[in-house]
UniProtKB/Swiss-Prot annotation:
This is Methionine--tRNA ligase. SUPFAM superfamilies: Anticodon-binding domain of a subclass of class I aminoacyl-tRNA synthetases (SSF47323), Methionyl-tRNA synthetase (MetRS), Zn-domain (SSF57770), Nucleotidylyl transferase (SSF52374). The keyword Zinc applies. It is found in: Cytoplasm. Belongs to the class-I aminoacyl-tRNA synthetase family. MetG type 1 subfamily. One of its GO terms (biological process) is methionyl-tRNA aminoacylation. Its main location: cytoplasm. A motif ('KMSKS' region) lies at residues 351-355. It comes from Thermobifida fusca (strain YX). ATP binds at S354. Zn(2+) binds at C146, C149, C159, C162. It is an enzyme of class 6 (ligase). It catalyses: tRNA(Met) + L-methionine + ATP = L-methionyl-tRNA(Met) + AMP + diphosphate. Keywords: Aminoacyl-tRNA synthetase, ATP-binding, Cytoplasm, Ligase, Metal-binding, Nucleotide-binding, Protein biosynthesis, Zinc.
Amino acid sequence: MSSKRHILTAVAWPYANGPRHIGHVSGFGVPSDVFARFQRMSGNNVLMVSGTDEHGTPIQVLADQEGVSARELADRYNRIIAEDLVALGLSYDLFTRTTTANHYAVVQELFTGLYRNGYIFSKTTKGAISPSTGRTLPDRYVEGTCPICGYDGARGDQCDNCGKQLDPTDLINPRSKINGETPEFVDTEHFMLDLPAFAEQLSEWLKSKGGEWRPNVLKFSLNLLDELQPRAITRDLDWGVPIPLEGWRDQPNKRLYVWFDAVIGYLSASIEWAKRTGDPEAWRKWWQNSDAESFYFMGKDNIVFHSEIWPAMLLGYSGKGSKGGEPGSLGALNLPTEVVSSEFLTMEGRKFSSSRRVVIYVRDFLERYDADALRYYIIAAGPETQDTDFTWAEFVRRNNDELVATWGNLVNRSISMAAKNIGHIPEAGELTDADRAVLDASKAAFATVGERLNRAQFKAALQEAMRVVAEANKYFSEQAPWKLKKTDPKRMETVLHVALQLVSDAKTLLTPFLPASSNKVYEMLGGTGTWTGMPRLEEATDSIGGEEGVSTYPVITGDYADNEARWESIPIVPGTPLKPPTPLFRKLDQSVVDEELARLEAAAGA
């Protein structure tokens, strides 16, 4: 096995019915970027892909309400979301969208392969329609009481309270989410994915993940196997990917269900990336090599799609379900190595809700605060393994106490004293036991933090990295180089050399978490070139969804290989010129808490 691993970082696709809020990016965004950046620094071949999920009824309904087409609405939020994720520093190799001709072609190929192998069949079911409009009500637009747990607010596809999968006809007292009326149920023909045909294969695969996956994800996924039922993969609507079969392709009101096409986006985005890089077959290194690895990042409400449905689709397309079959034209495809799910982030004790305006959008947040401050909070205090509440008081405290007073303070006092008194990185004289101990601990942290990051234990990894910062601050205070200036200037230079090496190490350890500020520290230490790559927007041109003509849309990409960052202690170079540093982070006034709470209450009450 090559020492360089091929690692697919597959990031859940944000839905393009509005801007994304900080709860969204705490689940799919920041954790996946921390992981991808670390793996790149470790020398691995990373492919990080995602895009906007643009089909389905919610977009169609919102577009109708605004008097625009579904396409226009998707175009608007595709751009807004892409701009916000770039501002947050998420290092996608490709962030695209589900309305490209490439995506349509790959989705239809997956459907065709599954159908040919016998894992898709048609069935007449009961579909909900609005009595007043005659329009179809997809399952997510039918609500009612869950027949399992009694929760009043279960959707027609799933109860968020107990996690059980449902159909609209299962609900007690069903009602339309749009206007509250009781829906009518009529016969309609749909295609179904035969999930029970994968029960044995899914069980064997999931049980092999014991000790590797987060316990909550594995337990939830195994429980899903107890209730495997065929699941509809088509819907009665005109906004989505056409069904690629004779007699169905041209039906105006039958489309593939949005969840079916969205999970295929990981594959279609990888194929699109390969085409854009000039090597159309390159995607296969991440999807078909036996030693390739794939990590899927999402919030816990999407576990079912990634640990049950998508693996079933991959097995069926590859001809590996209970009915056998042959791989489709793309070839056999790898199952996920790990499904990495975060829990939910709440806000000041309340569930995020765009409709009730209990929300802060990424764009609004970044207009007032630094991206790295948000990234730090999400990892340090976020919902990695349990639901967590975002509070402005805690955000301000962590920003001021941990970023400004701890890490920022170490950077400032170490570099400023060396720049002022020496003007460059000094030579190290003879090292004392204290010098060697703190340097050895700093070097050892790369293995400790790296092991945590490899296992997607981001909070623990950040704590270990910040422990290096704390020990460096302690060393600086105890050695008191400002006192040595007159009594022992050579010793002062040695202490400053050690302190600057610790700053350099800490910068490297914190790079996956805090890429923008790590670039600043690299420059403050006299570094040249790019330390760690940052994402950028590019305009892409493609025919959209098989329609006539072409469309221009933004994609996120970046140059992440051509930089200096690598996961090891890199010796600083004596003689490198130093300039007085600028503040690394902004200290926030306590008044921010009251201002933001007032802003939240005003919005929620509007």
